[in-house]
Amino acid sequence: MSSVNLTSLGANQLKNTTTGEMVEIGSLWREQAVVLFFLRRFGCQVCRWMAAEVSKLEKDLKAHGIALVGIGPEETGVKEFKDGGFFKGDIYIDEMKQCYKDLGFKRYNAINVVPAAMGKKVREIASKASAEGIQGNFSGDLLQSGGMLIVAKGGEKVLLHFIQKSPADNPPLEEITKALGISANVQAGEKPQCNEDVCTR
């Protein structure tokens, strides 16, 4: 059972990257179930690949009345991210990073971020992203981790609370659809074999 307090979390403010309007995160699940994808940062190559992966579900989510929303911890890189078309849902910014804190998405430090970013799984996904033409950069907050939160309509309950243990962690697409009780006709991207020459972007 998730320990997330949706009442207190729901009062946190997010900035809509299209309108600039500030909204409570709770408004995103008031009228519909929602998949909230929390990115580490918008310039992260691995995050962009993950965004493209979860976006494969957008059509099926929409057909079931479920919203797909991306949330980043800062403005840096958001225009390039949106222009790149990596993500098919609405995008918000948690400027205070309060949602990240409340959901237990950890912050790395200067010592542990390097081994985390150079891990085999990170390099494998970076290699896959490069093969698919997805590039990245090192702009912005390199220390924040992310995850995912899926909330039932009306904030009835948390359906999935996923916390990254490493920068390459992401819930499989089938885990997302299972949590929502829907089926989707999509093919998940294959995890590539590690290439020692590739490092995370």
UniProtKB/Swiss-Prot annotation:
User: Pfam family of this protein, just one?
Assistant: AhpC-TSA_2
> Where is the protein localized?
Cytoplasm, Cytosol
Keywords of the record, alphabetical order, are: Cytoplasm, Fatty acid biosynthesis, Fatty acid metabolism, Lipid biosynthesis, Lipid metabolism, NADP, Oxidoreductase, Prostaglandin biosynthesis, Prostaglandin metabolism
* InterPro entries named among the record's database cross-references: PXL2A/B/C (IPR032801), Thioredoxin-like_sf (IPR036249)
* Catalytic reactions on record: prostaglandin H2 + [thioredoxin]-dithiol = prostaglandin F2alpha + [thioredoxin]-disulfide; prostamide F2alpha + [thioredoxin]-disulfide = prostamide H2 + [thioredoxin]-dithiol
Gene Ontology biological process terms from the UniProt entry: prostaglandin biosynthetic process
| GO cellular component labels | cytoplasm; cytosol
Give the superkingdom in one word: Eukaryota
- What is a GO molecular function of this protein? prostaglandin F synthase activity
What's its EC?
1.11.1.20
Where would you say this protein principally sits, based on its record? cytoplasm
Tell me the SUPFAM superfamilies matching this sequence. Thioredoxin-like
Stated family: Belongs to the peroxiredoxin-like PRXL2 family. Prostamide/prostaglandin F synthase subfamily.
What does this gene product do?
Answer: Catalyzes the reduction of prostaglandin-ethanolamide H(2) (prostamide H(2)) to prostamide F(2alpha) with NADPH as proton donor. Also able to reduce prostaglandin H(2) to prostaglandin F(2alpha).
Q: Which PANTHER family match?
A: PROSTAMIDE_PROSTAGLANDIN F SYNTHASE, PTHR28630
Please state what the protein is called.
Answer: Prostamide/prostaglandin F synthase
What organism, scientifically named, is this protein from? Danio rerio (Zebrafish)
